[in-house]
From Swiss-Prot:
Main subcellular localisation: cytoplasm
Gene3D superfamilies xref list: HUPs, Tyrosyl-Transfer RNA Synthetase
Residues spanning the signal sequence: none
One biological process term in Gene Ontology: tryptophanyl-tRNA aminoacylation
Keywords from the UniProt entry: Aminoacyl-tRNA synthetase, ATP-binding, Cytoplasm, Ligase, Nucleotide-binding, Protein biosynthesis
Protein name (database record): Tryptophan--tRNA ligase 2
Motif 'HIGH' region per record, residues: 74-82
PROSITE patterns, per the entry: AA_TRNA_LIGASE_I (PS00178)
Catalytic activity annotation: tRNA(Trp) + L-tryptophan + ATP = L-tryptophyl-tRNA(Trp) + AMP + diphosphate + H(+)
Disulfide bonds: none
Source organism of the structure: Halobacterium salinarum (strain ATCC 700922 / JCM 11081 / NRC-1)
Top enzyme category: ligase
EC numbers on record: 6.1.1.2
Amino acid sequence: MTADGNDVTPYAVESDDLDYEKLLARFGADELTDDQRARFPDHPLVNRGLFYAGRDVDDFLTAGEQSIVTGVGPSGPMHLGHAMVFYFARRLQDEFGARVYVPLSDDEKYWFKDQTPAETGDYLRANLRDLLAVGFDPELTRIVVDTRDADVLYPLATAFAGDVRHATLQNVYGEPDNVGQAFYPAVQTAHLLLPQLVHGEHETLVPIAVDQDPHVRVSRDVAAKARYPVGKPGALLMQFLPSLAGPGKMSSSAGVSIRLTDSPDTVREKVRTHAYTGGRASVEEHRAKGGVPAEDVPFQYLSAFFEPDDAELARIEREYRAGDLLSGELKDLAADRITEFLAAHQRRRAALGDVTEALDAFRLTDDERQRARDAVGFGY
C-alpha cells in the first residue's frame, strides 16, 4: 500500500513525511470529528490529534459493552511509543469499564525478523513485565501469547485462514517471503476477533498506529462474511510518534528511542544528544527568531503525552516561539517529565516479582478458551 508514492505496510514505512490525509483516502478510514474527540476520556493523544482517524468509532462510543485490542510484537525492549498506547488503553478501561485484550505475537517475530526463539523469549519476558506494570484490571484484561496460547489461537487462525485469499494477502501486505508470513494475517485476525468469540458479538476498538491498519482491514473483511458470531472491529488510528532523531516512526533501536527501562541519566543523555529540535544556528538567532514547536521533538513528546495541562503546554509553546525558552531548556523540561513517568512505571515493574505468576490472573480461563473454539466450530 502506498501513500503519495511511499510504501506503508505493517512491516515497512518508507517515508519520513507521510501524507496522513492521503493515507485515509487509500485506507478508507474517517478522520475523527470534534464530537468524537469530546466523547473520549480527556487524554492528550486524542485531544491533540495524534489519534486522528478511525473506523466505526461512533459505534464503539455508544456501545454498552466494549472491548479494546492492542498488542505488541516482542522484537526488542518496549519504548515510549508502546507505553503511550497501553496507558491510553488502560484509561479507556478505567473510564468505560472496557475489556482489554493484549496479544503478543512471538510467532510473527520468528517469521518476519532475523531473531532466534531464545532472543524472542527474552524480549517476551521483558515486554510482559512492562505490560503488567501498566496496571490493567486483571478481571477485565486478557494477555495472550501466540505460542503459549496456541490451543485457542491456532484453531481460530485455521478457521479464518480460509477466508483470507491470496489476492488479498498480496494487495494488503505484498508477496510473503515464507509460509509463516502468509499465514500470519489469519493469526492477527484471531487476535482482533478473540474478544467477541469469547464474550459474544459486541463493539471492539483497536487503537493502532496507522501502518498497522491493514491487519484491521483484513479482520473486518473476515467478519463481514458473517460465518462467525462477530461484528467488524473498529479502529482508532494513530500518527507516528517521531523518533528522537526527528520525523519518522519511533523504533526499538538503542539511541533513537527511549526505553521503558532507561535510567534518568540515560533519558537525559538521549534527549540532549539525539533529540531533533530543528533549531537555530545560535542562541542569538533563537532569541531573535524563536523556535519551531512543530519541528521540535521534545515539544512533540510533551504535547502527545507528557504535559496533560493545556494551559501549561500553551505557555511552553508561547515562550519557545518567542525565543524566551531555549532548545536546551526545552530538552531538559521534556527529559524531566519523561523521567517522572518512567520512575513510576519502573517502581511498579520492579514490584511485580515473578512474571509467570503475575501473568496467571490475566490469562484466558479454560471456559473462555472453550467458548472461543466453539464459536468457530473447533470445540471438539
